[in-house]
Structure formats: C-alpha cells, structure tokens
C-alpha cells in the first residue's frame, strides 16, 4: 500500500458521550478490505466514567476485548502529569480527560487497565505505565506492545536490528506492511510541546489537541491485526513476557513487584498466570503448539528485568562517550539496556532479556563503575 496522508479528520464527530452509551463492540474487526481507506469513527471526550462503555469499566470474565491505548501529559513519567488517556475501540475513540474528569475518572479505568481480559495495544508502554503507576497506583497489564512486536517480527524474518534500533511510532505508521500512512502532524505537535510544555493541560481541548490525541490510537487495532498475521507462536510467547517486563520497567518499588500481576510462566501443560489461573490472550493461541514442544523437552527461555543501581558520579562511565560504553555492552550481551535519561530515574540502569544475557550485562556494567 502506498504511503498516503491521514484521513480528513474534520469528518469525525467530536462530542460528549451520552451516559447510556452502549455501542461497545467486544470483537475487533479484521483489517479493512481496502486498506488504503480507513473508516472514520466518532471521537468522544470523556469527563465522567458513566460516558465509558460498561464492558470496559467492568471487564467480563468470559470475553476478551482488544483496545488501543496511549497517554499524553506534561513530560509524561512518574512526576510528569497525565492529562489525557486515549482509548481506541472498534467503533469509537474515547479521549479520557484526566484534568476535567479528575482522579476519580482514571481510577474508574483501573480494572480495565489491570485486567487480563482486556488486551491493550500500545506503542512503547514504559512511560505510560510509569505515569499510571506512580500517579494513580495502576499496574498496567496485558499489553501488546507494537514496538516489541515489530522487533520480534524483524528478527523472525531475518532482518537484524542494532541494539539501539527501536522503531518509532511515526515510522511504524509509515511502514506499508502495517499501515502505510504519513503522520506529518506529529512533528507539528512536538514543536508545540517544545515551545509550550503545558500544551496538553489547556481546556477546552483545541481541535489540534483532539486530532493529535486521536491519531495516536486511531490505527493501533489495524496494526495489531497486521502484526498478528506475522508473529509466530514462539514470538507471541516472548511478546507476552517482554510486554509485562516493559510495564514494570520504570515502576521501581521496594517489594520487587510483589504486588504486581504475575508474569506468564510455563507450567507442566499450560501457560498460566499464577494468580488468575486463566489463559492469557496471547498464550491461548500458542497453547497446542507449545504443549507438543514441552512433551519433547522444550522450555522457552525465561526473560527477566534487572535493575542496577549506579553510584553517584558513575553514570557517565556506564554510558561512555556518545554512548559508546553502554552500546558495547548491548552488542556483547544481546540484552536490552535502558536508562532513564532526562526523565529519570537518574541512578538506575534497567536490563531486560534472557537470564544469562542479563547477568553478563550486569557484570560488565558493574566493571565499568569500578575505580582503577
């Protein structure tokens, strides 16, 4: 599909949601027959929980729901305030206004955001998860992270990526394999944010705010459908596990995530969540495949998240000149190494990957902190 401009968003209706809104669809439709044309959907600005679909507010235990998710705020992180949370459903986009709706509105969304029965399609969930956790006590769970999925697909199809090669959302949208639309307005919004960090706090929301917020989730369900056609069973397992680790990444606490949902693990016959004892959305599709492999002695390589505390004044050594030191560790170990950067935390390094790779990275990074 050739790259095209985004649809004319002026055709979309933008209005409050009636309190009895009941048009929530439980199943995500397949990709449009003509993928060069995306159907327009209404955009609803939500300031009260009663304006959200009941099946979202109270996720049914016997059904699986797939939604698109993104968050906007002031330099969004643990301290950067969440202003808008966007939800893309099959037939509508909901802009959940955290400012006018206050904490009560976001707390009303907590069961859905933590539910294993609602799959949240999101691009790079780490900072969104951090903001939700530290500002609202929400433990984001059951995500389909399109950034992770893209890397797994590239690896499976034989296109090797460098350790720092993370696909941006704009680049993912432009990729004709998944969406094939340009997102020129994203740069305009970034320019406005650089000039005015309070951009997302203004009320009522301007047309460009509404359009930009909606565009960040509009195509996620379509991308999800495309990616599911490319992900093999082994990749789905790694996607489920790594997505859970991404959600935890910046959400550091003192109890080693004891109060978080359990990570997916391999039992004797089934993949289960230790606490819920139910199959997850991704693992259901690979169950039969992996049961056969288990019988043959196969065990998926467990991945972990390790948090390395860096002593004061040592982060420069860890990173190295122009990132050379940390880049060499990534290339040597194959683990994913993440630093907080300007948003922090400034004294920690986060390492995600198979256990052996993570332990090797830990040793090398500790060596760089030593005084000689």
Language-model region placement:
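Conserved DEDDh/DEDDy metal-dependent 3′-5′ exonuclease domain
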Residues: 39-230
